[in-house]
Amino acid sequence: MQKSLITTPIYYVNDIPHIGHAYTTLIADTLKKYYTLQGEEVFFLTGTDEHGQKIEQSARLRNQSPKAYADSISAIFKNQWDFFNLDYDGFIRTTDSEHQKCVQNAFEIMFEKGDIYKGTYSGYYCVSCESYCAVSKVDNTDSKVLCPDCLRETTLLEEESYFFKLSAYEKPLLEFYAKNPEAILPIYRKNEVTSFIEQGLLDLSITRTSFEWGIPLPKKMNDPKHVVYVWLDALLNYASALGYLNGLDNKMAHFERARHIVGKDILRFHAIYWPAFLMSLNLPLFKQLCVHGWWTIEGVKMSKSLGNVLDAQKLAMEYGIEELRYFLLREVPFGQDGDFSKKALVERINANLNNDLGNLLNRLLGMAKKYFNYSLKSTKITAYYPKELEKAHQILDNANSFVPKMQLHKALEELFNIYDFLNKLIAKEEPWVLHKNNESEKLEALLSLIANTLLQSSFLLYAFMPKSAMKLASAFRVEITPNNYERFFKAKKLQDMVLQDTEPLFSKIEKIEKIEKIEKIEKIEKGEEALAEKAEKKEKEKAPPTQENYISIEDFKKVEIKVGLIKEAQRIEKSNKLLRLKVDLGENRLRQIISGIALDYEPESLVGQMVCVVANLKPAKLMGEMSEGMILAVRDNDNLALISPTREKIAGSLIS
């Protein structure tokens, strides 16, 4: 049996879990169930990261010891995953003695190999990210030095430190990613990583003396003032939990096929530091690093100061665990940022779950009972519905193919296309008419086709919505097991069936208006409504345009707006807002345009996008870079969106 490892990041215990943590962990649980059903022996690992300066500070504010504080928050994470019925095999804490032993032994190995040396570090330290920022990449704003990753203020520090020779692994890392093009998904994230490596890697500070709450160095180092840097400590959890260098039950056979699920904010640590550490320790590198985006709340980034951080457990208690799983995994393409709203959640529940799937099963059970006393033979399906059977199998196979590519939203979209297809087939064939016309053989073939297809679909649905899938399969007296997966889903074997009633899969949520009223009350409580009314009042007070505000058609014609195709996109050093774009305007060269959209768009996501460009704007220098045009965009409150043609156009096409 093939062994594999699926991990979440270990979650930092400076705060309680929110919907972002739940999203990551639900993805991992989905993959665990998917690959287990296919016969793999999967080890699903999660846990908590409990060392570092932030934990020390948070504990001090609460008059607790760091360990007592970590105990309380770690328990909240574990309880939440138990509430969601997540099928994890290991829950690791970096305060576990076995983990400490692994980290100290790994440190010794790397030191003896010559990959760790002692020196002095001077630089801008970000407490939030627990890392130093390269001086060339910090953002100097109003005499404050901001972290390029989180934009928080940094502190200039100088301290003695041990360093890991990260620079020695530039070439091996690039070779690894060249040989393994799908090692990071989505692929544009891999391009982002290799671009970063190609700029040159600095050796990495891996110990601290400025705080005490961390794993001490091995005793033989005889250097008690140092503790291990949080990222070396944290990343080694993926190995320590499997018994590496610590005497625990050895499960390292799982390690060779590791899939790490991470958010885009910790991509660099997992895609550069982690494989370099593994190379130093002569351990196999991961199979895949799966990188997801962030969740916003109704267009606004989650923030404690705004009071819009969502508790996934409370949402699940209100709308259902399975329903929330479906929404989070279906609503947004994996890798991209997604926006959460209760209204969208309710619409998904009512339309997709209750209407498309729930009502379909109810209709089938009702007709099977009425016309055949629940007993359906499959012998005539191929005689009456060969094309429909082939199409159903094709849709299911397509849905299944998206999961290994980490296109989970497409897998669910295609899976629910099956239910749409079957509902339309019922409407087209009108089984009540077949019954009226005494075409019982054809009617039985139709209902048996629907029953067999629903049963087959339950084996793919299981990964995403396990309880609903088991309930669906129970209507056909079948259990969800690896053996039955082979028989019903993989082999697509048609079955004679005796159906049975089951409790409804889902319940419709009534009165969306009521939800909107609740949300309005919540907004008023947060003061958002008052701000909106103030802005609206200000807008109304604006005077209508006078004749002096108008421009003539001749003036407008002076502005040359063209369709542009973005060919390249890069960040500009020392700026957290500007991107350097190379744009095709149908000329014999690419135009360089400097655009202030870096806070809203990742560079890699822009390549290949059509945009609208003011092409005859006078060239100007921004941050020492020449800009030969302007990309048009629209801003709504804090959200910025590029203006693009609704259909593909030839680069250089004039907009009029």
Curated annotation (Swiss-Prot):
Record-level GO cellular component terms: cytoplasm
UniProt short sequence motif 'HIGH' region, positions renumbered to this chain: 11-21
Question: What's the Enzyme Commission number for this chain?
Answer: 6.1.1.10
Catalysed reactions, as listed in the record:
tRNA(Met) + L-methionine + ATP = L-methionyl-tRNA(Met) + AMP + diphosphate
Q: Where does Zn(2+) bind?
A: C126, C129, C147, C150
GO terms (BP aspect): methionyl-tRNA aminoacylation
* One function term, GO molecular function aspect: tRNA binding
Q: Does the keyword Repeat apply?
A: no
- Entry keyword set: Aminoacyl-tRNA synthetase, ATP-binding, Cytoplasm, Ligase, Metal-binding, Nucleotide-binding, Protein biosynthesis, RNA-binding, tRNA-binding, Zinc
Residues reported to bind ATP: K304
Q: Where in the cell is it found?
A: Cytoplasm
The record's free-text note on cofactor binding: Binds 1 zinc ion per subunit.
Place the motif 'KMSKS' region on the sequence: 301-305
Cofactor(s) listed in the protein's UniProt record: Zn(2+)
Q: Which residues form the tRNA-binding domain?
A: 555-656
Task: Tell me, in a sentence or two, what this protein's role is.
Answer: Is required not only for elongation of protein synthesis but also for the initiation of all mRNA translation through initiator tRNA(fMet) aminoacylation.
Question: Which family, according to the similarity comment?
Answer: Belongs to the class-I aminoacyl-tRNA synthetase family. MetG type 2A subfamily.
Q: Quaternary structure per UniProt? A: Homodimer.
Q: What is this protein called?
A: Methionine--tRNA ligase
